[in-house]
Amino acid sequence: MPKVLVTGSSGFIVPHVIESCLKNNYEVIGIDVNDPVIKDERCKYIKDDVRNLNEKDLKDIDYIIHLAFITNIPHSIQNPIKTTDDNIQMTVGLLDKAEKANCKKF
């Protein structure tokens, strides 16, 4: 069974993404700094920051659906450049780790 990592698993759209993955027989792992919006016993959830993942964590992951972003609106308004930079760095860092771990798709 292919394994998919869904980042930002407490986000608004993620329940639909996870449900679609499960219907298509994917093993699903969600990661977010917050508790998941939906709790499905068929999914494994990790409560952590995506930036803390390493290559070893991704070694058995076939696909990554990256939906994690800093969405704190007051912080984003006060620090738009830092927030944008942090989001870009998070994505680039995850892409780099995924490539080194030989993930099939990002």
Please place each PLM-identified region on the residue numbering:
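N-terminal Rossmann-like NAD(P)+-binding domain of SDR-like oxidoreductases, especially those catalyzing
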Residues: 1-106
